[in-house]
Amino acid sequence: MIIDTTTVQAINSFSRLKSLNEVYGIIWMLVPILTLVLGITIGILVIVWLEREISAGIQQRIGPEYAGPFGVLQALADGTKLLFKENLFPSRGDTRLFSIGPSIAVISTLLSYSVIPFGYHFVLADLNIGVFLWIAISSIAPIGLLMSGYGSNNKYSFLGGLRAAAQSISYEIPLTLCVLSISLLSNSSSTVDIVEAQSKYGLGGWNLWRQPIGFIIFFISSLAECERLPFDLPEAEEELVAGYQTEYSGIKFGLFYVASYLNLLVSSLFVAVLYLGGWNISIPYISVPEFFDFEINKVGRVFGTTMGILITLVKTYLFLFIPITTRWTLPRLRMDQLLNLGWKFLLPISLGNLLLTTSSQLFSL
């Protein structure tokens, strides 16, 4: 069988077209992921700058002002400094656990952003079990902290890792029960469905008013999960030097701070999504898709998505003032007080709140 030149050229052009389509497919898949990572990076820089400015205002002092206008580049300068510092390893520590621990803490928190709807149809993974996937993923982070503490071969680090694990277990259960109550109210565990369930009555339809007890418990539990004051026992300076971070330096030390602010941002985003209506305009009977005519007008679709993202971020950063202010307001708890608050106070109340929510949903059928 003889194949002429035209056939060979057709085969070559087809194979070239197929390879180009594969490349375009990979690029199209990576674009939303890279966009999300870039947005998260900018969000963390904004949080660090906000915290420093708010802290300076509370303490009546001047915050960062030399690195960039109003000190906005100070966090970037600190990160660059840590990037070029030497990475030290404990002489008798477990090098593998010591190196893997910070990565697990950061990656597990980063994965949580995949189920957050920043705007209408602007979510990386719209799953039916979105909120519970976040809880499952976030429960992996304490394993990384425990590995870091154990791999350091240092009593302060190991105690800090144990405290982080105990604190996470204690407050994960009330947090899960609050999320389960929200799922019952919305008849779905998808983050997108939960936001849309709050859209009908505007500001009055927020789950904040339907679940005030759950909101308070969720806020306290998320503070404990983020290890923010008054729940920063795993790294209490007066007791454990720096907890599981004691032996770390350089970029690995910086990863723990990145994980802390990632966790703070994702917790605030979930508060905005679960309790504050997400991307919706706070006007009764007007939702973002209807207001900007998503189905017909492409320009309106782009503008509406942008407005939804801005609304979500405004709610998130306004809520961030509360945990930042709490840091400089309340003293640190003792370990026994922390565990008693989680197991003897928040757990029974969150369970009672879940039973009340279930009863109200059954009677409304």
UniProtKB/Swiss-Prot annotation:
Gene Ontology molecular function, alphabetical: oxidoreductase activity, acting on NAD(P)H, quinone or similar compound as acceptor; quinone binding
Bilayer-spanning residue ranges: 30-50, 104-124, 129-149, 253-273, 302-322, 338-358
Keyword field contains Transmembrane helix: yes
Subunit structure: NDH is composed of at least 16 different subunits, 5 of which are encoded in the nucleus.
Membrane topology listed for this record: Multi-pass membrane protein
Reactions it catalyzes: a plastoquinone + NADH + (n+1) H(+)(in) = a plastoquinol + NAD(+) + n H(+)(out); a plastoquinone + NADPH + (n+1) H(+)(in) = a plastoquinol + NADP(+) + n H(+)(out)
Family the entry assigns: Belongs to the complex I subunit 1 family.
Function per UniProt: NDH shuttles electrons from NAD(P)H:plastoquinone, via FMN and iron-sulfur (Fe-S) centers, to quinones in the photosynthetic chain and possibly in a chloroplast respiratory chain. The immediate electron acceptor for the enzyme in this species is believed to be plastoquinone. Couples the redox reaction to proton translocation, and thus conserves the redox energy in a proton gradient.
GO cellular component: chloroplast thylakoid membrane
InterPro entries documented for this protein: NADH_UbQ_OxRdtase_su1/FPO (IPR001694), NADH_UbQ_OxRdtase_su1_CS (IPR018086)
BP terms from Gene Ontology: aerobic respiration; photosynthesis, light reaction
One Pfam family from the record: NADHdh
EC number(s) per entry: 7.1.1.-
Subcellular localization(s) per the UniProt record: Plastid, Chloroplast thylakoid membrane
PANTHER family assigned: NADH DEHYDROGENASE SUBUNIT 1, NADH-UBIQUINONE OXIDOREDUCTASE CHAIN 1
Keyword terms, alphabetized: Chloroplast, Membrane, NAD, NADP, Plastid, Plastoquinone, Quinone, Thylakoid, Translocase, Transmembrane, Transmembrane helix
HAMAP family, per database record: NDH1_NuoH
Major subcellular location class: plastid
Record-given protein name: NAD(P)H-quinone oxidoreductase subunit 1, chloroplastic
